[in-house]
Amino acid sequence: MKKCAMKKYLIVNGDDFGATRGINRGINQAHRCGILTSTSLLVNTPWSQEAAELSHTSPELSVGLHVHLENGVRKLNSGPSQVRTALDEQLLRFQMFVGQLPTHLDSHHNVHRDPELLPLFLELAQRYGLPLRDHSEVHHFSKFYGQWSEERHLEQISTGSLTRMLETEIEHGITELACHPGYVDPQDTSSYSVEREAELWALCEPRIRHVLAAQSIQLISYHDVPRLLAGAAV
């Protein structure tokens, strides 16, 4: 990435789009009022269609597929064909909701990192030319997260913490900063709840844009990645 490496490009990607109505609202607000440029859509929840409809109102937002595999499928009890079928079905549902292919591919709880599952995810990514998290020219950055060792660490997702990360840990080239903004609501049964609102406030803090400018970090989405990589190859 010769030309690409001359600059710092940052994708801010919100996982779990479609998980709940509160998460949908949070991701939408983080895009409209904050620095979020991309999201990853769950397609097998009651709020998936609502999320897709929200994305249609924000054409600059890149939308990827956030694959969610049930435990039974994840164990490969019926062999790779069961997982392959689940991946194909979720891609088809994504196209039905969004009207186009995803801009990128990742997975809930990063199950694609499982050595048994990874080849099947790579197969899908290669078939459709999709960047797969950890397996593309986009560097994945996961430190903006409010739980470690099953303990809550809101200080890790504060405006100050995000500022320090942007100032010291964003590399030249293309980086995806993963985040999980949202509003707490009764539909969210996960342990990651109030952390979502803390992330949302940090992402929407106006001072963060000044930090990006001071560090010469350019916000992009996955829509921009093919163009940047093509330019870097020249």
In which residue ranges do the predicted regions lie?
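Structural preference for beta-strand elements that scaffold enzyme active sites
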Residues: 9-11, 36-40, 60-66, 102-104, ...
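C-terminal domain-boundary segment and adjacent tail
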Residues: 190-234
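Acidic-and-aromatic substrate-binding clefts and catalytic sites of carbohydrate-active enzymes
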Residues: 17-21, 41-50, 71-76, 108-116, ...
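Active-site beta-loop-alpha junctions enriched in small/polar residues
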Residues: 15-17, 42-44, 66-72, 108-110, ...
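Catalytic domains of cell-wall/extracellular-matrix polysaccharide-remodeling enzymes
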Residues: 91-170
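Glycine/small-residue-rich loop that forms an oxyanion/phosphate-binding "nest" at active or ligand-binding sites
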Residues: 72-93
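Boundary/entry segment of secreted carbohydrate-active catalytic domains
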Residues: 6-21
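Acidic (Asp/Glu)-rich catalytic clusters
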Residues: 27-33, 48-64, 92-98, 168-170
